[in-house]
């Protein structure tokens, strides 16, 4: 699936902040159409899968915070829900 403008901004922010070995961003908005917080234009619900050396030695909570910090204002402006899978290489 091709990412829209919000997904592309997320990808750029995560690549810049975390230098991931693997990054996958899945727009799950269609699965939430009609739910509270769903934007009719889409790009409101995402799942990000990130494998980054930056996560080595970090707890799950720390990893999620790192992802949230990297995405910054996108989380409040456009992204209603974010599911995160964050791993260090080899996990």
Where do the PLM segments sit?
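A short interface-forming secondary-structure element
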Residues: 50-60
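C-terminal structural segments of small proteins and small subunits
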Residues: 58-91
